Amino acid sequence: MVNAGAMSGSGNLMDFLDEPFPDVGTYEDFHTIDWLREKSRDTDRHRKITSKSKESIWEFIKSLLDAWSGWVVMLLIGLLAGTLAGVIDLAVDWMTDLKEGVCLSAFWYSHEQCCWTSNETTFEDRDKCPLWQKWSELLVNQSEGASAYILNYLMYILWALLFAFLAVSLVRVFAPYACGSGIPEIKTILSGFIIRGYLGKWTLLIKTVTLVLVVSSGLSLGKEGPLVHVACCCGNFFSSLFSKYSKNEGKRREVLSAAAAAGVSVAFGAPIGGVLFSLEEVSYYFPLKTLWRSFFAALVAAFTLRSINPFGNSRLVLFYVEYHTPWYMAELFPFILLGVFGGLWGTLFIRCNIAWCRRRKTTRLGKYPVLEVIVVTAITAIIAYPNPYTRQSTSELISELFNDCGALESSQLCDYINDPNMTRPVDDIPDRPAGVGVYTAMWQLALALIFKIVVTIFTFGMKIPSGLFIPSMAVGAIAGRMVGIGVEQLAYHHHDWIIFRNWCRPGADCVTPGLYAMVGAAACLGGVTRMTVSLVVIMFELTGGLEYIVPLMAAAVTSKWVADAFGKEGIYEAHIHLNGYPFLDVKDEFTHRTLATDVMRPRRGEPPLSVLTQDSMTVEDVETLIKETDYNGFPVVVSRDSERLIGFAQRRELILAIKNARQRQEGIVSNSIMYFTEEPPELPANSPHPLKLRRILNLSPFTVTDHTPMETVVDIFRKLGLRQCLVTRSGRLLGIITKKDVLRHMAQMANQDPESIMFN
Amino acid sequence: MVNAGAMSGSGNLMDFLDEPFPDVGTYEDFHTIDWLREKSRDTDRHRKITSKSKESIWEFIKSLLDAWSGWVVMLLIGLLAGTLAGVIDLAVDWMTDLKEGVCLSAFWYSHEQCCWTSNETTFEDRDKCPLWQKWSELLVNQSEGASAYILNYLMYILWALLFAFLAVSLVRVFAPYACGSGIPEIKTILSGFIIRGYLGKWTLLIKTVTLVLVVSSGLSLGKEGPLVHVACCCGNFFSSLFSKYSKNEGKRREVLSAAAAAGVSVAFGAPIGGVLFSLEEVSYYFPLKTLWRSFFAALVAAFTLRSINPFGNSRLVLFYVEYHTPWYMAELFPFILLGVFGGLWGTLFIRCNIAWCRRRKTTRLGKYPVLEVIVVTAITAIIAYPNPYTRQSTSELISELFNDCGALESSQLCDYINDPNMTRPVDDIPDRPAGVGVYTAMWQLALALIFKIVVTIFTFGMKIPSGLFIPSMAVGAIAGRMVGIGVEQLAYHHHDWIIFRNWCRPGADCVTPGLYAMVGAAACLGGVTRMTVSLVVIMFELTGGLEYIVPLMAAAVTSKWVADAFGKEGIYEAHIHLNGYPFLDVKDEFTHRTLATDVMRPRRGEPPLSVLTQDSMTVEDVETLIKETDYNGFPVVVSRDSERLIGFAQRRELILAIKNARQRQEGIVSNSIMYFTEEPPELPANSPHPLKLRRILNLSPFTVTDHTPMETVVDIFRKLGLRQCLVTRSGRLLGIITKKDVLRHMAQMANQDPESIMFN
């Protein structure tokens, strides 16, 4: 019952020659892949292996290896991503401290490592160990005083400038794709776009190195987003080792989805959150098999990172938090306020950052990327140094803000006035009045907040690797901690107020300012990225308990609603639009009442559709058509009169087939007839040898009728991953809709410039 | 540019009459819905609300309410599902203890609650409090001795029989759909099938009550699967309150997916695991919006359950576990062995259970469901009572097996010989030689294992609510604990062996038998259900730490591989096939080289396809066609000669339209011409008034060419949720492929009986 002779689905190109000519089935740079066709090709490959595996033991083993290669790739990705993340963490640690001083015993030790080896490791003296010397101590032998301060200040700025200059130069010279967070581009690539070199080996190497440099330089950026890019580069590298993945753009994207999960997993130490991030934010086609493998890759990466143990505390997570008191219903109000703040911050950041990036693209500003980086770094360093909360690295800052004030905490933020009558228990310290340190800290935090807000807008989008998870979280954490301290002091001084009376007696520990910082961080991150489930799960993995999930969720939901009210796009989608990538978002709902006939080409008044006929055009006709148009493919019809559709031929394959036939097949000349039918057409006796091209004809092109609502067409494009779709009415070919047409139509309907969609 | 006059997409039925006649757009029982059409209808509804909302403030508020209704439904589902789960837990607790005795102070207290209120609440005497009386004490005033034992034995059996009889009678009389776990049917319903009453209010009520009865009766079944059904009934109930969900079968299924997540969330106290379970196992169409809402519903449900606090320990999770020692690499070998065991158990269970269920369906056995339940209950009770590990409830058993032996543990399983020279630390007890109790326990556990394996096969599928999560986990936990104790004793007595030497010194706590039980439970559950990510995440939420995720994952992966080697179907898919539901599994890969032309109807030699012409058939012709065939719809073509496709008309809507026209429109008689075009056809002067039916015509039917590979067709059916698809060649209509045809073809290709697919 299987009609094998007629078997020539979209993936089968081999009913004529045994070996397809080279390059058939590949795509050009900046083009969109055809998911159905990739899937079909993979099934063909799989069928071949399965049928071969019955022939001999060797083939059977090969088929087993093929089946296992997916897991092997995941293992390798996990190992490499985890290792790179560990190395980056260690290097950043060392280089950040290098800005302040150097370790005498071994210059490659960071401040903390240097003082570990020192003998005086009592808790109080940990920060002052003789082996660690500030630059002023080393150079002019002064540790205090104005001149020492100025010297250290200068050294700080110099190192920052050096790191930033090195980073931007490396990116410019070796790997221009290494800049930015990479997530917008990865989203586009995963949706089926080709950007050659974006996930290449050079990008991997340069991004890893420059990431260390820029993070150490103290710029307001994080390593989390770029780590996703680095992990995807690893994924791309390993998938190129296995023909199953290297030769199939669809399968390769399954590996990349898993790699993205591994990237987030190592960035936060949150494997489940990483998988959900990949599912929710990054991936386009995410079958359940990939879910399982992503989970595996994310776990391997997390455990590799843990065995490297860069933080020296065998914790998996970036910010480990442990709170001792529950939260109370009345606290939901400040939590929701923080959510509103997060939403507003998200909106402000996206608008300002996009406006600034557009200006960079369109004005002369974009011509001096090195200068821009140097200037921003200099300003950042100059303003950051005097304030202790901006001088320290942003992850340390967040960590400090998240922390609950224990009894042994020496930080300025924990400078509360203790009741002398009270013995100090280790946990469960009651709310106390704030001391001088806390008030100073509040001022410094307020300044740090303004500084971070402004400088992050200008930093994200420069020609260096830059993530915005950490800066966003920092903004939220600062705001949250300030609100938290405010509520705490209010509750301490006014515990007879009706809102506090029920849950905040004197002597009780009722408000945890660290929790507010965490809630604020989640809200701000949510406002910028519009993540939902993955955000809450990542935060859940940080705290490790369901206890605090309700505050986090309340803030995340509020922040998303507030931000969505001002604009549906998250920062990544906004950057995708800014760059004009052909990305068909799964989350956008198309609700307009247009029909396929309104979108298809040719429009009314335009010249008719360029088609091929099945058996009446010469090679020259086709070559002229190819030269005169730049369409990616041509529908093939029975004849120009009947316009009944037979199939679809890709431009690239037509060109290759004709070139190949002219070189290899005898008797093919310019006026040879090209035919797509099974049998050659009846030709006059003296006509040249005709050229059969059935093998490059896609006999199952996708068609819709002209009355199909566009919402259905959009759905089909999204779910099946089409490149183009033909439009018919009562069996006659009317026109064609490409992915670009769909995107332009959607932009037009949303009152945006349709010409902003640049690629096909 | 919007061609509004011609706007008649699949969802728009209103281009002629303002109000569609009743019942248009609904589906018959045991039919499949058309997802694209449901989606399109929802978009129409949404558009209408959005455009109306600009008219007045009242309409704007209504549109806000509509937008919020999704969250309200989720909140209500979470609240009700959590409450029901809490009530079920409390009732089961009480009724399970009722089989053994009664509380004198208040008969509605369970054993534990009874002894809480008692004054003698020291730890050792907790089990013996005077207020709790065994039946023998109460009835004949004897607590020890053979006659007391026999009396208690009899009472145990009597109560079990009473509970089981009540349950099976209630199910038979009031709600036949309340039987089984419900998950296979819910999977089918979520994939787009209609089973009226399956999620009705009666089913909800009866399933809740009978679930308590059967779990208390001591049968080898669990409440976890049925809780998913109960939660889905809640979801169905609340979605019927909002027209957004009640009138759209597609939207309703989004709510049901979230409800399933809430069900698992309360079953295990694992909200994230619940969402992933819904995503991985149950749901079919799971957009990201639903993911977020499911998470919300799952959280609300979990917190509602926690505030009810049925276990009295304010723990959210069903089995809370805390281990004190890490695992070692060498232990991976027994863990993988447990995985193999789990896979073998899964295969054995599925094969035997399906064979037994098939026998029940086909022989006289199925005619006596009450007797069957009584007999199985009697046998279960008689065998279970003498063995303490089968007498206690299965969840208590699992809980005990998971537990690490602490210093204060009085259980038989923790009867180790202590070193008298050693002081007893609270945690971190070194490995010790097993005492007599442990050896007795091993024998009893072995017997319990055999008993559970056999009896579960016969229990699952009877006409009572029955889940198999708990029995499967029990089988695995018993096997795991036995292996764990074995490894522990081996390591204790032979710590000089090379495999133990590196990690198991004398006096160290190296093996945790409880962890083996947990790994075994995961492996067995994985073997039966073939869950992957959700299984690991549920287990992760039980232990609450990433520490033990690698052993769990190793066992889950092994178990899935071993079980898959013997057959790809999990127990739920196997039951779906057994019942012949039209379920198109997303996980099955279709790899055969067939084409659409091989599957479409009519086959070669069959009578031609029944079609309607656009303007030449009379009402009578159509009525005859409808009477003579039972197709769900008919393609409409220009004329029988050209066979050019215009659209598709649903049978149900044709019948309704003709009935309606005959009643309401004047001049419609049997030989009126029916036309589907915009303009009426030119008719002879004396012909009766024609009937315009364009509004029921779907102008955008889905078409594929006859050369389309079936793998693509299957993909399209899956991803777009089609009911049928028309097959064309060069614009001519050749045939039709329905979902049933696809399923039959897939069954045939897998060498199964294609007639087993029963519904359309």
From Swiss-Prot, chains A, B:
Family matches, as CDD domains: CBS_pair_voltage-gated_CLC_euk_bac, ClC_3_like
Pfam families linked: CBS (PF00571), Voltage_CLC (PF00654)
Site residues by UniProt (Mediates proton transfer from the protein to the inner aqueous phase): E281
Cytoplasmic compartment segments: 1-67, 567-760
Coiled-coil region: none
Predominant subcellular localization, coarse grouping: membrane
Effect upon mutating D15N: In MRXSRC; uncertain significance; no reduction in outwardly-rectifying currents; does not affect its localization in endoplasmic reticulum membrane
Listed result of changing L221P: In MRXSRC; marked reduction in outwardly-rectifying currents; does not affect its localization in endoplasmic reticulum membrane
Consequence when changing A555V: In MRXSRC; marked reduction in outwardly-rectifying currents; does not affect its localization in endoplasmic reticulum membrane
Role description: Strongly outwardly rectifying, electrogenic H(+)/Cl(-)exchanger which mediates the exchange of chloride ions against protons. The CLC channel family contains both chloride channels and proton-coupled anion transporters that exchange chloride or another anion for protons. The presence of conserved gating glutamate residues is typical for family members that function as antiporters.
Stated name of the protein: H(+)/Cl(-) exchange transporter 4
Organism of this sequence: Homo sapiens (Human)
Primary gene name: CLCN4
